[in-house]
């Protein structure tokens, strides 16, 4: 074991040369009655692994070279090199050494020592949210919009469990997140102590990795490993659970021990093989109707993707997570595909003879009936995570690699003089012309009814007023889909939304996190009345920090997406989807009154009910300094179209109708 450990340390050191190298041992609890075990951890694909199995499953969950930038180093405070300090102060200095500048938090008894230590940091800015779910979504918005890991701190028990939705969201959307939780003192673990929950057990399947620290000397290494794991390979959330007595214990930190991740690092994919890239170029040359299908795995490859499209002329469609990775107003953009994607994007994939899938999961909201998806096409799948290759759709060519490196390699091949003749054969003009006709035949549009405000129109006006430059966060529901269709996205990390988990309440805290990460940027939360209410308390944080977050609520007084399904598939039978005041009997009362609520938080707000009022109201919102809320009252009968029913195929696509019709 000693020899193996020494070898592991050597294998890790080169890969981690640019990272701080703390040390120590970590112990993890398996269950309440089992003895402590050294260095146990769990990952995306494990439940109760042994130590040996753990190192393997970590690597399968998160592989390849880093897809997010290594965090910029923050200046580290000057300290006496041998000075003893509390474990909590060691945690904070470890965060500083990992480049952390912002922490989103909500304090409690088991995490008090960490919060006290944070007040002593000259480097880290602390952002107090009003709910732990809000703080974790804010950390997610920070990470999604910047590429740097977001950090959140919560107490034990309900504080830790309130993080769970956000951890699951980050896990599904591959967002680099480090969550630090307080825990009951070690002697009380397993005794059902006050606010004790086994958060490590809770989060085994929704984190990339997690730790329970049982030795104060482990803190520097574990924090370092947490950031390395969160931001390399396929990014994801990492949880670090720290008992209160560990936070209080005095120790001299050691910053020079290597990380203990030999299994993970040894399985990081190498650069893509040249022969596989040659095969892809050959398939492109043989194709007549190719399509690029781009996901969130391309968020660090925007330039390379645009260059590849320049060289090949292949049309591009994106997933919900891929929005912004290719400019949506580019002539070769087909915008989003899938359940609520454009007709022409879905038509293109249905008729393609070659599908280049880059950084995607082939999830059900895109594929529908998976056997019918891209059934005429040869499929090339490039992804950083080997577990995704062939999981939902079997490719003809699979490449486990960082998409950025794969695109760089293919671009170099296409640019070589020897490939000039081949490039002349890449003439897809007839295919592009066919798709242009579909764009004209099936544009993204909407109907108007007098002075009622179409929600799509409100988003179009916002797009025009902001010139498509805003960072847009959303909740989940109809407004989310309309925001994909009617706003222009030209760059990666401009679009922030809960895609895989579909968590309502995401928009406002995520927008707050994005505003923290991008000072001076225009940040707008396009939200629904139902989704906003789930984390409306974060208006307090936005106001107190005077963040210039604009909130545009598309308020239809209903749970709109569920109402749409009720209209289409349940004979319009309403089952608890009306969110207004039942006593109003549809008498025009807007409930709750978001304008009054915003005023209670000290945030200026306005409401519009007529189409002719929208532009002036949006202009006023965007011109206002600091936060602002605009309540846009829209009809609940609107449907998000196009729509492919769940488990449907392109032939089942719906392009007309709304709640004013019967089905």
Curated annotation (Swiss-Prot):
Example GO molecular function: acetolactate synthase activity
Its cofactor is: Mg(2+); thiamine diphosphate
Which parts of this chain are annotated as the region Disordered?
Answer: 1-56
Q: Where is the composition biased (Basic and acidic residues)?
A: 28-37, 44-54
> Which residues are involved in binding thiamine diphosphate?
132
Which cellular component, as a GO term, is one annotated location? Answer: chloroplast
Q: How is the cofactor bound?
A: Binds 1 Mg(2+) ion per subunit.
Query: Which sites bind Mg(2+)?
Result: 529, 556
Q: Any idea which UniProt keywords this protein has?
A: Amino-acid biosynthesis, Branched-chain amino acid biosynthesis, Chloroplast, Disulfide bond, FAD, Flavoprotein, Herbicide resistance, Magnesium, Metal-binding, Plastid, Thiamine pyrophosphate, Transferase, Transit peptide
Q: In which pathway does it act?
A: Amino-acid biosynthesis; L-isoleucine biosynthesis; L-isoleucine from 2-oxobutanoate: step 1/4; Amino-acid biosynthesis; L-valine biosynthesis; L-valine from pyruvate: step 1/4
Give me the disulphide-bonded residues: 152-298
Give the protein's recorded name. Answer: Probable acetolactate synthase 2, chloroplastic
